[in-house]
């Protein structure tokens, strides 16, 4: 971007049966990496290879939707259909597909609700529905659980796990180590380059996490799950300045 190097020496594969989390701090290049995979951004050097005719869905962190525009959830999802630019009307099968994907994501009863009436978690599901309507083989998601509560985060993770079980490859970005990363089967730790790659057991180590986030962390294990805490955090006393 404007001659600023965002990523370098990045090399990894996304396989058809993979569920991958790209982990790193803000500004580490996670979104840029997704855009390279999506091929909406060209690398300054190197190659991004994608299988011909591969169907890729994308759920950005911020959707470009006008919340004051008078449309319902059903209409918003319908607008993402492939033929929306070719003809303004939708076929019966396209409408049925929208109903099916809304039902699958647990928001079938919200179809007639105005989009600005949705909660944060409901908005996330609506945008996921827009991506799924095109029946992607690979789904890319940028921080899909940011700004939602714990219950909604778990619901979204279960939805993505179900999609993966059905054969869809999933790639998501996150900086949430305990809430998201530790539950994923495959992680890529990024801080302008790939710092580590493998299972949570492989990469959620003090050394890799310090290289990724620039902070010392302690890694604990509970019931087979790795948990990350700040190493010797400074206690906060009310009334003092941070």
Region locations from a protein language model:
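Catalytic Walker B motif of ABC-type/P-loop ATPase nucleotide-binding domains
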Residues: 139-142
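The feature captures the beta-strand-to-loop junction immediately N-terminal to the Walker
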Residues: 23-25
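Helix-to-loop junction immediately C-terminal to a conserved catalytic motif
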Residues: 38
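H-loop/switch region of ABC-family ATPase nucleotide-binding domains
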Residues: 174-175
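Conserved ABC ATPase "signature" region
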Residues: 78, 92-110
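ABC ATPase nucleotide-binding domains
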Residues: 206, 211-242
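Conserved ABC ATPase signature
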Residues: 114-118, 122
């Amino acid at each position: 971007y404007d001659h600023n190097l965002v990523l370098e020496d990045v090399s990894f594969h996304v396989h058809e049966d993979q569920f991958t989390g790209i982990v790193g701090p803000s500004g580490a290049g996670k979104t840029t990496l997704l855009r390279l995979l999506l091929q909406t951004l060209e690398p300054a050097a190197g190659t991004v290879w994608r299988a011909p005719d591969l169907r890729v869905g994308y759920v950005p962190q911020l959707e470009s939707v006008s919340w004051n525009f008078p449309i319902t959830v059903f209409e918003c999802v319908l607008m993402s259909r492939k033929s929306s630019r070719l003809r303004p009307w939708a076929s019966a099968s396209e409408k049925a597909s929208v109903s099916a994907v809304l039902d699958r994501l647990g928001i079938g009863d919200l179809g007639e609700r105005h989009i600005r009436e949705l909660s944060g978690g409901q908005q996330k599901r609506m945008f996921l529905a827009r991506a799924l309507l095109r029946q992607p083989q690979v789904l890319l998601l940028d921080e899909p659980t940011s700004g939602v509560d714990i219950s909604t985060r778990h619901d979204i993770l279960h939805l993505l796990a179900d999609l993966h079980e059905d054969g869809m490859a999933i790639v998501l970005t996150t900086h949430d180590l305990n809430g998201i990363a530790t539950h994923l089967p495959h992680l890529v730790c990024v801080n302008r380059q790939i710092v580590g790659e493998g299972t949570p057991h492989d990469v959620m180590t003090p050394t890799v996490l310090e290289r990724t986030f620039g902070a010392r962390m302690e890694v604990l294990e509970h019931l087979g799950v790795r948990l990350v805490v700040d190493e010797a955090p400074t206690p906060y006393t009310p009334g003092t300045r941070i």
